[in-house]
Amino acid sequence: MQAKAVARTVRIAPRKVRLVVDLIRGKQVGEAIAILNHTPKTASPVVEKVLKSAIANAEHNYEMDINNLVVEKVFVDEGPTLKRFRPRAMGRASQINKRTSHITVVVSEKKEG
């Protein structure tokens, strides 16, 4: 059985979130939360919040045991890009892309044995 949580349109670039997400893939949830607490990245609290939501969904909706949960899948997709303009020299302007992310965390119970 799997439980899932998604955070959509998070205002952090996907490239930056993927650095954090790659640290917790395949880990037990307790270990994953400990890793996120000690990772000095802006994306860490956001990913931790999504992970805790997935754990709560597993416990409440599917009555899984929290002690046996493993981060099965975690991935980051690109959300809508906010386009802004920055003034440049000689009356020109250049485009600034403010990227957003969709963060998905899937947890499942570890197989016995």
From Swiss-Prot:
SUPFAM superfamilies for the chain: Ribosomal protein L22 (SSF54843)
Keywords on record: Ribonucleoprotein, Ribosomal protein, RNA-binding, rRNA-binding
Annotated InterPro entries: Ribosomal_uL22 (IPR001063), Ribosomal_uL22_bac/chlpt-type (IPR005727), Ribosomal_uL22_bac/org-type (IPR047867), Ribosomal_uL22_CS (IPR018260), Ribosomal_uL22_sf (IPR036394)
GO molecular function annotations of the record: rRNA binding; structural constituent of ribosome
GO biological process: translation
GO cellular component terms, A-Z: cytosolic large ribosomal subunit
UniProt cross-references to Pfam families, sorted A to Z: Ribosomal_L22
Assembly and oligomerization: Part of the 50S ribosomal subunit.
Family affiliation: Belongs to the universal ribosomal protein uL22 family.
PANTHER family the record matches: CHLOROPLAST 50S RIBOSOMAL PROTEIN L22-RELATED (PTHR13501), LARGE RIBOSOMAL SUBUNIT PROTEIN UL22M (PTHR13501:SF8)
Its job: This protein binds specifically to 23S rRNA; its binding is stimulated by other ribosomal proteins, e.g. L4, L17, and L20. It is important during the early stages of 50S assembly. It makes multiple contacts with different domains of the 23S rRNA in the assembled 50S subunit and ribosome.
Name under which the protein is recorded: Large ribosomal subunit protein uL22
